[in-house]
A protein has these predicted regions:
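Flexible metal-binding regulatory segments at protein termini and peripheral loops
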Residues: 1-115, 230-238, 327, 331-339, ...
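Conserved cytosolic catalytic loops of P-type ATPases
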Residues: 27-49, 53, 182-185, 215-323, ...
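Soluble-to-membrane junctions at the N-terminal ends of transmembrane alpha-helices
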Residues: 75-94, 116, 136-159, 330-362, ...
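Transmembrane helix-loop-helix hairpins at the membrane interface
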Residues: 84-223, 233, 619-621
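Juxtamembrane coupling segments of multi-pass membrane pumps/enzymes
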Residues: 174, 187-258, 296, 418-420, ...
Length: 645
């Protein structure tokens, strides 16, 4: 059983890696993938062995929280968390401004009164605005782990305690020896302020990456017009009642009027419009991508989320709740956005050692400055170590891949391209061979002819090419992808359709096993193969291919096996999917490059490495916190550029 569960308390990629590792260690869980970007865990588990309550208890023991209550949606949780974050950020800015005024402007920096006021302001900032960092760091400490919150908590606590010591004993310890001393409450406050500000901006940006899910969820109406069994007096019609969609049962009769969203999947029992007495026209563009409204008569199926554009219809509920086609699409997109690309698993392993490595670098920095710092050795050593702890940013590494994937998968869904898992989107850009089934995939059979006499029929009469098939094949081949058409037809027919579609390679008289054999042959030649099919006889080849695609109007078996489903008959979705994969992967590597380069350059600068070369430049803790906030926000904003492409 698969389920997507919201996770509370994750601050960086170390957190998501810890939660994932803990879930995977539990008996009864087949697989678990935790996404920092969506703050969810995609868990495949056996409910007979482990329950959601068991998972929640184990994750709570590890310092995080799983939200398993059905009445608490991810949207609601994220909204509440963001409201609290924003409130603390605004309060932190107030404390920061007051602290800066007292420490730098109004009264002398060494004034005992000013330092005591700054101490109180910094303490209030730590206890209220920075509470989440210390609670999280303490939980991590109890479980012998560390995350980004640990770095923030440690650095601000060191700066605060050192400043508190100087406030009460500075003159006695340092002044008596002729050493100039300072307090650094402003650094402690500004670190928390900048980190909170960065997280606020990051959350807003991440919220934009999930817009595709919200659009899909927006297609689900909240209420339905239920046709009751109570007749209207003096007529043969029945009374209707507006009810919550959650109360609809299978078999209920529902009326939907023009412009309203169909609430559940069902079968039309009655339809009418001003154009046709016995039919209504339903806009299915959001599901199938077809721009022309489909005619629906009694006996036709309709899907939740689609909209009658003309007329009204009555329907009997067939699939409700999580069993509707729309719910399945939403679930598929959520699971895909929560899944991990292969490169993300490598980053997660690096993230697990990142925080201990940064702590070690900070300790080494402290020792070196303590030894070579002269009279101001201790303050310089402390500030340098604090700057190193603050500037390190595992968040940027953790967000680099999932944010790009979330935007890419969401954008694909808007184009009626449903991607089941992140690895398919990542691998699609590598393909250099495409195997496509002819009938039902490349062409549309004519349903209005007698196939017992098809030998006497013209090829064009039997079937037609799908929309933009020639242009799609041309674009694929221009990208360097070799296209192979597989057909069960005789040589003459196969040659005709291959030539008409602009395909150079084709096979005729193909049996189901031949498709699998061709995929294997191409792979043995070193090619990365994508298989596109729509029928049961394509499933073996789909399962073997590096990337598999099914047509949305094909069989359920083919769609279950395929990693990518094209909801539209427009084959331009094929090159569009490849193009989107290329852009997404390019964005991932851009993000990773920035995340690693940022840490590689900024950590040494914060440690003061330029002093070795006689350059008197070093990043202060205050600027370090600003740069750290900027680094994670920039990664998310860069990923959002995909939405504009």
């Amino acid at each position: 059983m698969k389920k997507t569960i919201p996770v509370i308390g994750m601050a960086c990629s170390v957190c998501s890696a810890n939660v994932e590792k803990k879930l995977q260690s539990l008996e009864g869980i087949n697989s678990a993938s935790v996404s920092l970007a969506s703050r969810t865990a995609l868990v495949d588990y056996d409910p007979d062995i482990i329950s959601l309550e068991d998972m929640k208890r184990e994750i709570s023991n590890a310092g995080y929280d799983l939200v398993i209550e059905n009445d608490r949606s991810v949207e609601e949780i994220n909204r509440r968390e963001f409201t609290l974050l924003r409130r603390r950020t605004l309060a932190s800015w107030l404390f920061a401004i007051l602290t800066m005024c007292f420490s730098m402007g109004w009264i002398s920096h060494t004034s005992s009164f000013a330092n005591q006021i700054c101490l109180l302001l910094a303490l209030a900032n730590l206890l209220y605005c920075g509470k989440q960092f210390y609670v999280s760091a303490w939980k991590q400490f109890l479980h012998h782990t560390a995350n980004m919150d640990s770095l923030v908590a440690l650095s601000t606590l060191i700066a605060f305690l050192f400043s508190t010591f100087n406030t009460f004993f500075g003159e006695m310890v340092w002044g008596a020896r002729g050493i100039e001393w300072h307090t650094y409450f402003d650094a402690s406050v500004m670190i928390i302020t900048f980190v909170l500000t960065g997280r606020c901006l990051e959350e807003k940006a991440k919220d934009s990456t999930a817009s595709s899910i919200r659009q899909l969820m927006g297609m689900q109406p909240k209420t339905a017009r239920l046709v009751t069994y109570e007749k209207i007096e003096g007529t043969n019609d029945y009374k209707m009642e507006e009810v919550p969609i959650s109360t609809i049962q299978i078999g209920d009769m529902i009326e939907v009027r023009a412009g309203e969203k169909i609430p559940v999947d069902g079968v039309v029992t009655q339809a009418e419009s001003f154009m046709t007495a016995d039919a209504a026209y339903v806009d299915e563009a959001m599901i199938s991508g077809e721009p022309t409204p489909a005619m629906k008569k009694a006996g036709d199926n309709v899907l939740a989320g689609t909209i009658p554009s003309q007329g009204k219809l009555r329907m009997r509920a067939k699939q409700i709740g999580e069993n509707t086609a729309l719910a399945h699409i939403i679930r598929m997109v959520q699971e895909a956005q929560g899944s991990k690309a292969p490169v993300q698993r490598i980053v997660d392993k690096a993230a697990l050692i990142f925080v201990p490595a940064v702590a070690a670098i900070a300790l080494i920095t402290f020792i070196i400055w303590w030894l070579i710092g002269g009279n101001a050795a201790l303050p310089q050593a402390i500030l340098s170590a604090v700057a190193v702890l603050v500037i390190a940013c595992p968040c940027a590494m953790g967000l680099a891949t999932p944010t790009a994937l979330m935007v890419g998968i969401g954008k694909a869904a808007q184009k009626q391209i449903l991607i089941k898992d992140a690895s398919a989107l990542e691998n699609l850009h590598k393909i250099n061979a495409l195997v496509i089934d002819k009938t039902g995939t490349l062409t549309i059979p004519n349903q209005n002819i007698d196939f017992t006499k098809q030998e006497d029929l013209d090829l064009e009469t039997r079937e037609t090419l799908k929309p933009h098939a020639q242009e799609a094949m041309k674009q694929l081949q221009e990208k360097g992808i070799e296209v192979y058409m597989m057909s069960g037809d005789k040589e003459e027919a196969a040659h005709y359709w291959a030539e008409k579609a602009g395909i150079k390679h084709y096979q005729s008289k193909v049996l189901p096993g031949d498709k699998q054999a061709l995929v294997k042959k191409l792979q043995d030649e070193g090619k990365q193969v994508v298989m596109v099919g729509d029928g049961i006889n394509d499933t073996q080849a789909l399962a073997l291919a590096n990337v598999s695609m099914a047509i949305g109007k094909g069989t359920d078996v083919a769609m279950d096996v395929a990693q990518i489903t094209l909801m539209s008959d427009d084959l331009l979705a094929l090159p569009e999917a490849v193009k989107l994969s290329q852009k997404t992967v390019h964005m991932i590597w851009q993000n990773l490059f920035w995340a690693f380069i940022y840490n590689i350059i900024c950590i040494p600068l914060a440690a003061g490495v330029l002093h070795i070369f006689g350059i008197d430049f070093q990043i202060t803790p205050m600027w370090a916190s600003a740069l750290m906030a900027f680094s994670s926000v920039s990664v998310v904003l860069n990923s959002l550029r995909l939405k504009l492409s």
